[in-house]
Structure formats: structure tokens, C-alpha cells
């Protein structure tokens, strides 16, 4: 094994051991390592589960979105579809997006956080509900029958609060 691979293996195993010791779960599952780094940067508590909230902030459970793209944004994909729009709106408001008081959006550049923005859950809902409503009636006929929509850079800059 060459030196670079040996160093990588050591760092990988070390990261995993740190996360295991703290009850943070697998740092290499989905964007978990980014969530752990965001929580540490924001002085939030890392969520102990991979389902539901990503972290706990001063207001309770929080949602994190991150990107490695050139511009910040937040994708809300893979949302379960309910039978009616009324049920869907209730689900989004009470069980999914609106459940979290604060949503945090981060853009990573290389291995570092380039920027973090905070947005209230009700603002995120006001942005996403019209986008999701447009897709609702036809989503079940799609190849992937789940809802998804994004909060754009412009929306984050206009309605969010810059943290970093």
C-alpha cells in the first residue's frame, strides 16, 4: 500500500471511530460527515439518528442541506406522496419540512464550509409548497413517484440569514 492510501485508511478509520464513540453513526452514510462538520461549526448537537432531524439547535430539531456546487441551494427530494393534496400539505407542514423550526443551508468548497445560511421553517415551507403543489397531480405517473423541489440561491440570499 502506498503512503497516500495508508494515510487515507488511517484517517478513514479514525473518523469512523470518533463518530462511533460519540454515537453519531456512520460518517460516510449520505451527507453525514457534512452534517457533523456543520453541527460542530454551528455549536449544535449532532442528531443520534440518521432519520429525522440532522441536528439540535437552540430552538430544537433542525434540518441541514448542503451542496458542493458553485452556488448554494437546498434540495428536498424523495418526499413521500400522500393520497390528496390536503393530506400532502399536512404531512409537509407537520411531519416533514415544517417540523423543523430552522433549516440551515451550507455550501462546501473542497473539504471546507464556504458559507452557511439559516432560514425559518415556515419560510422554507412558503417557498416549497407552491413548487410541490405544481408537481403533485402528476408525480405518481413519473418513473420515480416521489416529490421534490429546491430552495434556490436567490431565495436563500433573499429570505435567509447569513451565519458564515
Question: Which sequence ranges carry the predicted segments?
Answer:
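Nucleic-acid endonuclease domains
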Residues: 1-164
